[in-house]
Each structure stands twice: as structure tokens, then as C-alpha cells.
Amino acid sequence: MTTRKRPLALLILDGWGYRENTQKNAVFHANTPVLDQLNAKYPNSLISGSGIDVGLPDGQMGNSEVGHINIGSGRIVYQELTRISKAIDDGEFDTNPALTKAIDDAIEVNGAVHIMGLLSPGGVHSHQDHIEAMCRLAVKRGAKKVYLHAFLDGRDTPPRSAKPGLAHFEELFKSLGTGQVASVIGRYYAMDRDNRWDRVSQAYELITEGKSLHQSATAVDAIEAAYTRDENDEFVGSTVIPDAQGNIAKLVDNDALIFMNFRADRARQITRSFVDADFDGFERAVTPKINFVMLTEYAANIKAAIAYPSSDLVNTLGETLQDRDLTQLRISETEKYAHVTFFFNGGKEEPFKGEDRILIQSPKVATYDLQPEMSSTELTDKLVAAIESTEYDVIICNYPNGDMVGHTGNFDAAVKACEAVDTCIGRVVEALEKVGGECLITADHGNAEQMTDESTGQAHTAHTSELIPLIYVGRDAEIENGGRLSDLAPTMLTLMGQDVPEEMTGRSIIKLKE
């Protein structure tokens, strides 16, 4: 006979921060009777999900990858942004074997060094300082043909903020005496993670064939033309920028292609289009034989050189539950599925023993303000059924709405997104109460609580560094102040009566009352 389990659920409300200022604060203005009631009835606090508390530079906004790694590992994990910036500062970057080999091999056959990545100071998927270091390294080692394919942000940065960065790189190449910004395209196309291959194909064709919707004389001209077309950075259509002789840079056999994004989830699809022999996402007109370098490991089954391999995280929450013969469920929509699985497990693709996964398809809409509830009802249907089954000791669930709709900059839609999640939380808590379960309700970082940039008046589409909520719906308890995301796994294990592995340096911040 199967033992009925009383699950402990962790509900992660993605992009749901706390902000004192109520202006254009979608979290504040949303009608959220369920969460209001839970806050009034149960222990709650605010915890940190940004900066040094999650292994990022001081003041750097958190993000979903970082948040889930810190939650799942139960320790502060120093992030790739910090790690690579330090390597550049120390000079180690200039001797990195994967990078130097790709450059040198291209030079040896008179090939080109192509560099692609999100040209942004956002620090979420990449940093333009890293891209500059890569351009300088290629020229320093003797490359005569250096081509930068710039993916534009406007999501982790203000919607129209790419121009200064593009101007800087044009001046950089002039000062270096070689190299050019060869193409620009919005991240909406180049960095899709939801199998919308029609978008990715536009970036692939731009880089391999020089095929584009637009052509401009300079990168600055390209962004100005995009703004004239009313395209924000994220949505800039494919634009090729010929050199002074009118030549268009195309990726060909024996060239190097170095991808300077350090975050995996939005780097995987376009990487596979370049390196997978059996790729079938779209029809590729050309498949050049190139030396491809991933800045970090985007997936274990992608066959390409890695400049900075992942460090192994052991005794994460998922692994600990496995080792103690406890069952666990991970559930989310497509947009955040990798976060509750791959990232939560410390960068491991394969499920642990006793770990089940449920993926709910995110709606196929151009932007999520068109459907702010996303697939939350279907997600909650599956989650409630899993709770009622009493099969799981631990359930990890992510509701993407606050983040995905927050990124659109649409305040009214973000309010609706928060309201949809609140309704779902009510159903989940009711199901848990019926089976004697408990839950922690928290977030991974802020977003929807700030929908306008107060300094510019533009829509605010980026994450924030605000504190995030934590509610314990369970026994009589107190929550200590000063908590961080890395405290959640030790707290969960303690609530379950389990010992905390020594690798988890977070602390249990919920103290049960006698």
C-alpha cells in the first residue's frame, strides 16, 4: 500500500517583488485577496534575491537562472557574470584555451572570427564588457577579420537603450584598426527559448547568409532606422551592415563563432542550429563547418567547445531528496520549465530518482501581455491533481506570469497577470489544506512591481533589485529577518525533519513554535 504523503510545496511567483513606491506597481495595484489573506494569517517576511546575496555583483538585479540555482543548491552560488568579469580583470581570460584556440585556428586559414551575443550592460544573459574583451583578444592575437553580430536587449535594459552601446563598439573597432559590427537583430528572434524556430531562423540566416530584412551603413544607422519603424531594441528586425567596400560578413567554413552569452536557457536553441548535425528546427540553406565556442556550458549534450565549464554542485535539494528516498515533482510552463529542473538541480539535465516533471505549454502568442494569465489555469489543474494524489513529499512550482508579462512593460496586463496567479494560489492552498500539506510562497526576483522607469518615463521591462516575499502556509512559526534565496532549501529540509547537508551554507529561517 502506498503511503499517503503530506507534501511541502514551494511556489515561486516569478518576477514578483516588493516595492514601497506604489506608482505603476502592478503587484500593489492587482486585486489579490488570496495573498492578502495569507499574509494576514501566516508568518511572512521579505528576503533578498539580488546582488551579493545571490553571488552577483553588489546592486546587480537578480534573474530567474540565478534565483533558481541559489534556491535549489541551498548556498550562494557565485554567478558566471562575476566569474568571467574576474577572469578578464585578472588577465586569465586572454589565455583561455577554448577562446585562444578558436581564434588561432581561424587566423591560420585566413578565416574570420565571428562574435555573437547580447550587446547589453544588463548582466542577465551577457555583459557588453565581456564582448569588448573578446573583440580585443581576437585583434590582439592577430585576427584581421573580426565580425560582431549584436543581439539587442531592451528587456533587461530600457526598451530603447541600445544606441550608446552600438556607437561604443563602432568606435572600439576604429581604435583597434580592424573589425566591425556586421549585423544587428533583436533578442526576440536570436534568443528564443520556446521552440519558435521561425524566429531563430532569421538570426541564423542573418549570420550565415547575410540574409536580412534591412540594410544600414552603420550600426547606429541601423538602430535609428529601427526606432523610425517603431521597433524597440528587443524586436529590431534583422539588419546587415556591409563594410566600406559593400561586402557582407557571412559565416563560412573554418571560421570561428564565439557565443558570448553566459546564461544557458536562451542560448541553447540558436547554438543547436549552428552545431547539431541532425538539427531539424528549420531548413538550413547552408551549414558551415566552424569552430563554435560556448562561453559557458549551455547543455551537456551540445557538442561544442566550452570556455568556462560549469563547476559541479553536489548535495542540492533535489539530490538530497533522492538520497533520502523522498519523492519530488517539478512543474511549470515552458517558459520556466528549465528553471525548476535544470537550474534548480544545479545545472544537471537528468531528473533525480523519484523526481517527476510536468511541462505545461506556454501560450503561443507574440508577447504575453496579449494573454497575461498565460497557462496558469492548466498549470494549476495539474498541480492540484498532483497534490491530491499524495504521491509527492516535495513539489516545486513556478508561475511565470509576473516576470513574463512584466517584461512587456504593459502595466494593465501585468496587473491582470498578478490577479490570475493570486486566483491559482487560492486553489493550490485549498488543495494542500485538504491533504495536510504545507507551502512556502516566494519569488526568484522582482519585476512586476516596477512597470515604469521613473527617470526616463519609459516602460520598465527589466528585473529589479527589490526584496521578494516569503510566506509560510503551515504550522505556527516565526520567520527570521535577513533571509536570502539560499536559505530556502535548508528551511524546507528542516520543516521536513531532515538534516541539512554541510554543503548547504544557507540557514533555516523558519522557527516552529512549541
Curated annotation (Swiss-Prot):
CDD domains on file: iPGM
Active-site residues per Swiss-Prot or TrEMBL entry: S64
Main EC class the enzyme belongs to: isomerase
Pathway connected to this protein: Carbohydrate degradation; glycolysis; pyruvate from D-glyceraldehyde 3-phosphate: step 3/5
Residue sites binding Mn(2+) 2 per the record: D14, S64, D444, H445
Residues annotated for substrate binding in this entry: H125, R155, D156, R187, R193, R263, A264, D265, R266, K336
Co-factor binding comment: Binds 2 manganese ions per subunit.
GO molecular function, one term: phosphoglycerate mutase activity
Pfam families linked to this entry: iPGM_N, Metalloenzyme
Catalysed reaction, written as an equation: (2R)-2-phosphoglycerate = (2R)-3-phosphoglycerate
Cofactor annotation: Mn(2+)
One annotated Gene Ontology cellular component of this protein: cytosol
Enzyme Commission number(s) from the entry: 5.4.2.12
Annotated positions binding Mn(2+) 1: D403, H407, H463
Single biological process term from Gene Ontology: glucose catabolic process
Record keywords: Glycolysis, Isomerase, Manganese, Metal-binding
Family per record: Belongs to the BPG-independent phosphoglycerate mutase family.
Stored NCBIfam families: pgm_bpd_ind, PRK05434.1-5
Role according to the record: Catalyzes the interconversion of 2-phosphoglycerate and 3-phosphoglycerate.
Subunit and partners: Monomer.
The protein, known as: 2,3-bisphosphoglycerate-independent phosphoglycerate mutase
Taxonomic lineage of the native organism: Bacteria, Pseudomonadati, Pseudomonadota, Gammaproteobacteria, Alteromonadales
